[in-house]
């Protein structure tokens, strides 16, 4: 059994908007290309192909997430907000915009559902015994998104959605998340805060992002 690469070119079409850093949009600040842009992920895929590592991977098609998949993690109100912004030409989602703008493009919810579905696809293929392990190369990212809001460029909490699939649909007893990123995986932590079936570990820089989040004393409810 192989290692799987979960890949869908449509994830590279996610529109993350322009980037103003910690500032709100302003006519006096020149925006930068967004730091969560397509090049960051496509470069990984290109390197896998150029180095021929891809030949040893099982490239697996994504099964798009359903509304029910999303609602295992996110509130109905938040899902409807994403749908409304997506169907109205796109725009900012994050209420706490100074803590990381989260933009979704016109009809961008379809891409966000593909990304969430990519995480589920990885879990499903491993649980079905088709793959030993899998890497989902997807965007928009997810570990900052909380149950009721976007944050830090993240629309849906992809890993948490895959975790809920494993627990609620496949009826696993216990799962664990190891989040290795300079930023705290606040979204995954908050979603499973009171769920003893999930163990969340975040390895991150202290007091980086979100500010004040991810202290060693945070051990669940």
Indicate residue ranges for each PLM-predicted region.
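HDAC/HDAC-like amidohydrolase catalytic core signature
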Residues: 1-221
């Amino acid at each position: 059994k192989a290692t799987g690469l979960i890949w869908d070119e449509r994830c590279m079409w996610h529109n993350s908007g322009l980037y103003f850093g910690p500032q709100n949009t302003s006519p006096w600040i020149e925006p930068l290309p967004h730091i969560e842009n397509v090049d960051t992920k496509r470069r990984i895929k290109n390197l896998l192909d150029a180095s021929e590592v891809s030949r040893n991977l099982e490239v697996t098609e994504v099964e798009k997430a359903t509304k029910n998949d999303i609602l295992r993690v996110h509130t109905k109100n938040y899902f409807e907000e994403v749908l409304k912004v997506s169907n109205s030409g796109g725009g900012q989602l994050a209420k706490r915009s100074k803590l990381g703008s989260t933009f979704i493009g016109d009809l961008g919810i379809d891409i966000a559902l593909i990304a969430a579905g990519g995480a589920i696809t990885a879990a499903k293929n491993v649980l079905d015994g088709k793959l030993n392990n899998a890497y989902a190369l997807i965007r928009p990212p997810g570990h900052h998104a909380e149950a009721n809001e976007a944050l830090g460029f993240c629309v849906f909490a992809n890993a948490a959605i895959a975790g809920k699939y494993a627990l609620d649909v496949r009826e696993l007893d216990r799962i664990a998340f190891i989040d290795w990123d300079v930023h705290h995986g606040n979204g995954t932590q908050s979603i499973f805060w009171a769920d003893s079936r999930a163990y969340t570990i975040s390895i991150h820089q202290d007091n980086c992002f979100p500010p004040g989040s991810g202290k060693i004393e945070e051990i669940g409810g």
